[in-house]
Amino acid sequence: ATALPVAEIVAYYQALAEAVSLPLIVQDASGYVGRPIPIDACVQLIDRYGPEKILFKPESAPIGPNLSALRDRSAGRARILEGSGGLLLVDSYRRGIVGTMPGMELLDGIVALWHALQRRDEEAIYRISLPISAIVALQMQAGLDGFLAVEKYLLVKRGIFASAARRRPHAWELDPETAAEVDRLFERLQRALTSDERGCLPG
């Protein structure tokens, strides 16, 4: 978002909502770029179009309190998606999100974590979420450049991408020591997922 009045922000999303039949996800990516979208704008959109048409992906800091504020200001109507790479998935789930939009590099971990949250398995929740959070913390140290560098590194490691090359310009390169820590955390996550699969078997 930019430093626009609430009325202009609402008008922008209204134009999109009127032009398409699909639901819209209003993403506040001000954790990376721009300024936060005011909660007043979000509430006006949900008042006008309802929760089936307008969903939200709040990423303005502090994410948890902002998520709760949107939930409360909309009287629980706002359908909210988590989008912090899994870093805040546990906290966000407990605040009432309806889903998450993960990156592909840790998708198996995010899915397993979501299932653990649904079944309220506290041991599995933290066994899985802690290595995810530690990996994302390493990504965050260099902002969007860090996210992309570690994401592509892991996608190559998993055999999904052939190259970790990124379009330039970018301001950060993944150094060998950070890569080694990512490897250690990724291995810990894989062990947690194997343990979780065994724990979910019947009998």
Identify what each model region corresponds to.
Residues 1-36, 170-171:
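Active-site beta->alpha loop and helix N-cap motifs at the rims of alpha/beta catalytic domains
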Residues 19, 30-144:
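Catalytic alpha/beta core domains of metabolic enzymes, predominantly
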Residues 11-12, 41, 150:
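Short, solvent-exposed amphipathic alpha-helices that sit
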